[in-house]
């Protein structure tokens, strides 16, 4: 693979995620030279000719900022009845995926450079990201890459990365719900979009996110333990997969759903060195939930339980920390260290 997006850009996205989680600029300073080299590599691939590239029908400025070059894994491991993957998927560029990640990485680099004090570099990355977004929007207006699709990944990704204009975004949200309804509220995403789908659905309707989470049929998270799994499978089909290339039974990618359980279901989010945001979202058929996060200051806890027609919330904030509490339908309050029940 030659710079396969979704994998190779971990060199930018991992330091970015660590900085967002812990607020430590030293991580960015340490990896900045490599991140800049990779960002430049991504920029140089835009608009280039490649022998196995699929025709997109784009020209001019739209083609100039389209990434349609190099081999890539693409979405990888979507359910077989959603997209049957063959060796050809790894032999050709994936312009929808690659342009989306190019725009996303450029936005991350803009934030990184701004945080480190280089305003000119930040603006250059921001401008490149804007051009990539416009190319992406143009691509999604073509018949071959239309937003009118049942492939959930191709709807989740642009919504998660903020790549669409207002009209396209409104259509994509409705089309995603329709795709889920037509697929029986089962997961149709692969490696790249599975970690994003519950976040996107939470923005649309939190109950839609819970409905997908609670699905026990294949493809679905709960189908695995329901069928005796003690690890996370690479393929949604597990041992029944017909593709030997994705037959691992201990492949944690789809386990990324656990982040949503922490930061949305139970609502624990780090927001600075010793400050947290606690914003739980009860829903679905769950009657209780609880999560604990071991911070450097101690354990942060957030939980909720259904009581009668309402909810009982409990939380714990370690010493020398504060938390902004945002409960459903109530104004935010700032809390000092201690244990609380609401």
State what each model feature region is.
Residues 1-8, 83-101, 138-155, 161, ...:
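Solvent-exposed loop and edge beta-strand segments that line ligand/cofactor-binding
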Residues 12-25, 154-164, 194-203, 322-324, ...:
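Alpha-helical support elements that line or immediately flank enzyme active sites
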Residues 182-220:
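Repeat-solenoid scaffold signature
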Residues 127, 131, 210-342:
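Non-catalytic C-terminal accessory modules of carbohydrate-active enzymes
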Residues 7-14, 101, 105-108, 132, ...:
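Amphipathic, well-ordered alpha-helical segments in soluble domains
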Residues 169-179, 213:
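Alpha-helical repeat scaffolds
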Residues 21-98, 113-160, 167, 267, ...:
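Active-site acid/base region of carbohydrate-active enzymes
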